């Protein structure tokens, strides 16, 4: 499973990229709004740092508007992926983008049927939301398993991005259930590195080494 970072913050992206584990970035209008910078300018900055997929979301609700926005976003850099909501209008736009060779990430996926429809429309990625399903008492892990099974049975190449990740367990389970990618907030990404026994082990090794010098 690959790691994307879910942020529009440049410092977080730079720090994650330096770790050598980052395969891409996902953004959304809420994340970009927090940064208080022009959307296109921030995307140019991100794509200058990260060579992998950078998801940029359209805000139009009709297919024509999404296509117009998406085509402009795609001009920013070759690694821009157009993020489109899981709606009928969204999938109309996905079909057009697919025919033009523009990569897409269909977001706000909450059922396997939605994922299958998005894949058949030509989506490069689908993004089921784990945390938001948890919030309403549904099992997001089972959803990822089901989507992965369906895609495997039918030979579908669309990749599954586990999104709305809130804690390290979400990452582990997403990997076990067949997600190709986890898009993770910076805070959660940093938590993945930590375990008390790792810290204790390093301290002991250093103490032993210093004693014998």
UniProtKB/Swiss-Prot annotation:
SUPFAM superfamilies: Aldolase. Pathway: Carbohydrate degradation; pentose phosphate pathway; D-glyceraldehyde 3-phosphate and beta-D-fructose 6-phosphate from D-ribose 5-phosphate and D-xylulose 5-phosphate (non-oxidative stage): step 2/3. The active site is at residue 83. It is an enzyme of class 2 (transferase). Signal peptide: none annotated. It comes from the Bacteria. It catalyses: D-sedoheptulose 7-phosphate + D-glyceraldehyde 3-phosphate = D-erythrose 4-phosphate + beta-D-fructose 6-phosphate. This is Probable transaldolase. The lineage of its organism: Bacteria, Bacillati, Bacillota, Bacilli, Bacillales.
């Amino acid at each position: 499973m690959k790691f994307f970072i879910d942020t529009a913050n440049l410092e977080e992206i730079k720090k994650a990229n330096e770790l050598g584990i980052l395969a891409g970035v996902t953004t959304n209008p809420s994340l970009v709004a927090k940064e208080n910078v022009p959307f296109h300018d921030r995307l140019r900055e991100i794509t200058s740092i990260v060579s992998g997929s950078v998801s940029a979301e359209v805000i139009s609700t009709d297919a024509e508007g999404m296509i117009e926005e998406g085509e402009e976003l795609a001009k920013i850099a070759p690694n821009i992926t157009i993020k489109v909501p899981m709606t009928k209008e969204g999938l109309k736009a996905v079909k057009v983008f697919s025919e033009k060779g523009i990569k897409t990430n269909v977001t706000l996926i909450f059922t396997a049927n939605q994922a299958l429809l998005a894949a058949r429309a030509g989506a490069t990625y689908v993004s089921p939301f784990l945390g938001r399903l948890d919030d309403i008492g549904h099992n997001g892990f089972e959803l990822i398993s089901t989507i992965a099974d369906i895609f495997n049975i039918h030979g579908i190449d669309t990749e599954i991005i586990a999104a709305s990740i809130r804690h390290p367990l979400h990452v582990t389970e997403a990997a076990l259930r067949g997600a190709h990618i986890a898009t993770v907030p910076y805070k959660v990404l940093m938590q993945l590195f930590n375990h008390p026994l790792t810290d204790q082990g390093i301290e002991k090794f250093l103490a032993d080494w210093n004693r014998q010098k």
